[in-house]
């Protein structure tokens, strides 16, 4: 998606972490997935870029050049201690955009206190959804049955200043603009005469490939 590629370090290749990493990879993001478990690394190495390393070890961060990444996702669920130490190490390495999975309220509180910017609830936030949010293209993302998704995005540059009707978003891209939220204003349902402004938040619905095309223009 145009001009929005990020380098993302995913720590932990369990079910959640592997889902985040594969989603980001499919979206064209620059991903490296890391786990200390060699079997997990081998299992995923043919699908996504991987490395075997223990991120609680500062030296391991240096070996994979962790400081070069824009964003990190701490997807460690089997050890609160390892999760917190890893998040702290990544912050110390200069990665300010940290997404960290929590397994309890207490875990979430600790992660927040050390500076993790986004806390992920392990029970309610599916890995695929988090992958889309981490990519930076979506403000929110809900996957529906039947291959349809509802997403919240900022207005793409190619439709700024156009009404929904004039932009022909449904005819050109197959998506539906459900509504628009302008800064300081109430949410408005997506009537055809509404103008899409630069800082508006759009709620749109469509299949993933249709949404991707709309974002790219």
List where the protein language model places each region:
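Cytosolic regulatory regions of ion transport systems
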Residues: 1-217
